[in-house]
């Protein structure tokens, strides 16, 4: 799945427009424009499609965490990942929406994905 697909899905799920997405990205100290988000949320087979860099998706997810949970000035800044995978996206969404393991399992089973609690905790572990 491309970063563009994830951004597009989040845009529709959160019911936000490009200006809101620029605002959320800015919370992670990154800059962009509404026009950039317009090209990043364009479907791959449509004219005007531009591939979204992973670091932008990472910044947007960090901004979403700050938007939903607030920024803790005593904590270090969230790291920007240059390579984003599905586990990273899931971890950041879990933090942003304060989801517990049971919540993730319920969401996955509602979407017809069979996943156990140990599998979810394994996905959330650091890759170290």
Task: Describe the role of every protein-language-model region.
Residues 62-114:
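Short, solvent-exposed interaction modules
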Residues 1-8, 16-52, 75-78, 85, ...:
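A cross-kingdom feature marking solvent-exposed beta-strand/loop segments within repeated
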Residues 38, 57-65, 90, 121:
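Generic detector of well-ordered alpha-helical segments enriched in charged/polar residues
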């Amino acid at each position: 799945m491309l970063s563009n697909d994830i951004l597009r899905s989040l845009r529709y799920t959160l019911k936000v427009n490009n200006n809101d997405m620029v605002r959320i990205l800015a919370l992670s100290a990154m800059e962009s424009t509404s026009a950039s988000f317009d090209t990043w949320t364009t479907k791959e087979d449509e004219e005007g499609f531009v591939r979204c860099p992973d670091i932008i998706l990472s910044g947007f997810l960090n901004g979403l965490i700050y938007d939903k949970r607030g920024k803790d000035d005593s904590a270090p800044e969230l790291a920007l990942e240059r390579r984003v995978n599905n586990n990273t996206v899931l971890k950041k969404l879990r933090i942003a929406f304060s989801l517990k393991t049971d919540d993730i399992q319920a969401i996955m089973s509602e979407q017809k994905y069979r996943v156990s609690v140990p599998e979810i905790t394994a996905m959330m572990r650091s890759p170290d």
